[in-house]
Amino acid sequence: MINSWAGLDDAGVAVAAARAGADVVRELFGRRLERVDKGGGDFATTADLAAERAILEVLRAARPGDAVLGEEGGRQGAVGAERRWLVDPLCGTLNYAVGSRLVAVNVALHGGAAAVADPFGGEAGEVFVTDGTHAWVQRGEDREPLVPTGGTGLVDVNLDPPFPGAPGFRAVDLLAHPDFVARFRPRVVSTTLALAWVAAGKRAAYVTDGGDLSGSVHFAAGIALCRAAGCTVTGIDGEPIGPAGRGLVVAADAETHRQLMSMIRR
């Protein structure tokens, strides 16, 4: 298996790593798990830690010269490496800890391929993938292109703190905006799986406050996926995401993005 990982392209490595993490997440679901306090009300479970170890095993075997930034383990791997993988082994830990299956496993090569695994999507989970140019959902060996659409009218809004954009922007205020109520229906899943759903046409958009999220272990895979699928991706200020970025607005199409920005800017 290790030799076969080394022969994969970057998208294949991302898929293999995300699936390895998703396997652990499924296996440990519903068990009593120890919690590791991270401060500020945040915590990791033994599932987070075990899933990250499984992901790192794949990445180290397949790309030993690359560096890794993990949500739980921090920076690891080759010092001075030009390539860096961003890993969030269990996005939605709070959901998972109380028995909710709304979680994702995120693996992204910074500026390249990425995979977002839904451990509980379908019989054996599904993986949303990009090679940096194309985007598809993979079930087993079957692939289906991702086609975003704003037709659902469903918009995921992240209401988890912190809220650095306040008081200028408050996500909760968007939900009460009369134009939002007339055009969209809010959803709050508290996991970046929602980004994959925008790329797949299951959501019209995703909105979150924040700073520069382009290099975040939580968001990098979903952002890469949405860009490759043809979504419109900006900060909450309408500007490109990056070092000076503010939060994230990902919309299935330009018109959905325009409508949301008109409400956010008011």
Residue positions per predicted region:
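Short coil/turn connectors at secondary-structure junctions
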Residues: 64, 81-82, 112, 152, ...
